[in-house]
């Protein structure tokens, strides 16, 4: 959510000046319910290009590896993460939770929380140590609790413009 506080460049600059197509954001997305679900499925199936998949928050695998403790658009969030990460040209983890599992991953970790490509300091995490995006890159981590908003927008501009 710190992304919305970015100043240089701000969210409007990202869209207007740099041409980023913000497909969906929990605070800005107009699609809800079935419309949001269709949008995610279109991206996951490759029917809509997904250049940069940005994920914020920990991946929750409880209970018993099902991920059903964290449901979104009719499925466990972890299933969306798998499908969208595999469809994306670039995957970006924002914040300590997405990068490393954050505070929720501390023992005894009842939620089964982990980061995208790291679990705490150990390479691996939810997507595994060998994950690479369609562009051949590992997960790009922007740590912080929260991540600095300008780091987020500046890195997105750098990725989008090559």
Roles of regions detected by a PLM:
Residues 1-162:
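Iron-sulfur-associated redox domains of electron-transfer enzymes in respiratory
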């Amino acid at each position: 959510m710190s992304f919305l506080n970015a100043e240089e460049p701000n969210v409007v600059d990202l869209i207007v000046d740099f041409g980023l197509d913000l497909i969906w954001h929990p605070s800005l997305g107009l699609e809800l319910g079935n419309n949001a679900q269709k949008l995610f499925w279109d991206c996951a199936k490759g029917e809509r290009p997904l250049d940069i998949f940005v994920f914020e928050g920990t991946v929750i695998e409880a209970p018993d590896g099902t991920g059903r403790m964290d449901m979104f658009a009719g499925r466990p969030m972890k299933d969306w993460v798998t499908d969208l990460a595999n469809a994306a040209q670039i995957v970006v983890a924002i914040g300590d939770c997405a990068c490393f599992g954050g505070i929720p991953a501390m023992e005894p970790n009842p939620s089964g929380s982990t980061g995208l490509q790291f679990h705490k300091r150990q390479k691996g995490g939810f997507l595994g140590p060998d994950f690479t995006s369609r562009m051949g890159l590992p997960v790009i981590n922007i740590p912080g609790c929260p991540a600095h908003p300008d780091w987020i927008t500046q890195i997105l501009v750098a990725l989008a413009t090559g």
